[in-house]
Amino acid sequence: MKVKVIPVLEDNYMYLVIEELTREAVAVDVAVPKRLLEIVGREGVSLTAVLTTHHHWDHARGNPELARLRPGLAVLGADERIFSLTRRLAHGEELRFGAIHVRCLLTPGHTAGHMSYFLWEDDCPDPPALFSGDALSVAGCGSCLEGSAQQMYQSLAELGTLPPETKVFCGHEHTLSNLEFAQKVEPCNDHVRAKLSWAKARPLSRRGKRVGGEGTGFGVGGALRQGLMVTGACGHSRRGMRMTCPLCRRLWARSASTTPSCGWREYGCCPGASTVTWTLRKASGDCVLG
């Protein structure tokens, strides 16, 4: 299974997933169809379907033009608001494209009908892949525009049950801003510090791919699965937030004027400790994860 990462618009990612034996391909979140078709032609593959994570313009705007250019193309997703949708998918439904299996995972929070896609290939040594749209990004998650914070938390918890070797392909390039925010929230967290150094050392076009178990403790099978789950948000209040580490409390208070406001529902132990579990009271902005 080959994944082509296609940066588009200001900070979006489209993807082309190729089954290398049959040369069958599936696109994820088509925003710029002509750019996608250039790569389809260059790779010499047959595009058979589009997987759309959610209905927002920057993830689905290319569907109508692509459907016009490729009659009979399947446009799949969970939300009936998705442009040119040909079939609505259900949570837990499985699809197959050649040797590639797709498991559909409903992950509401950012939108009510947000779907993430877990892909793997038969008899292939390559790790499975998760196309998470705006549910999960590098060191963050999407804003809760339609769903609740609890829904987002549950969605992330479900993604945390995926195999630890899973590669995560997200919908936006927000790596540096997420990690810089995370460092202000968790100044004692060595994982955040290491991941930020990792991100700064990498070319921008590669930061959209997050590999679980890469050595920094981040990844679907790393931070999430080991209990280092931090779900935060840029909201309008710091009420209800408690940190047990005095240093973290002092640093957080000192950076209050420059750090986006956060509303936390519960408390957690020191961010530098082995486990951190914070849940949300509300979420109206990017979240910190891991």
UniProtKB/Swiss-Prot annotation:
Cofactors demanded by this protein: Zn(2+)
Binding site for Zn(2+) 2: D58, H59, D134, H172
The protein's Enzyme Commission number: 3.1.2.-
Keyword 4Fe-4S: no
Disulfide feature: none
Keywords assigned by UniProt, alphabetized: Hydrolase, Metal-binding, Zinc
Cofactor binding description: Binds 2 Zn(2+) ions per subunit.
SMART domains referenced in this protein's UniProt entry, alphabetically: Lactamase_B
Molecular function terms from GO: hydroxyacylglutathione hydrolase activity; metal ion binding
Positions of Zn(2+) 1 binding: H54, H56, H110, D134
PANTHER family: BETA LACTAMASE DOMAIN, HYDROXYACYLGLUTATHIONE HYDROLASE-LIKE PROTEIN
Recorded family membership: Belongs to the metallo-beta-lactamase superfamily. Glyoxalase II family.
Record's function text: Hydrolase acting on ester bonds.
Protein name: Hydroxyacylglutathione hydrolase-like protein
Native source species: Homo sapiens (Human)
Lineage of producing organism: Eukaryota, Metazoa, Chordata, Craniata, Vertebrata
Gene: HAGHL
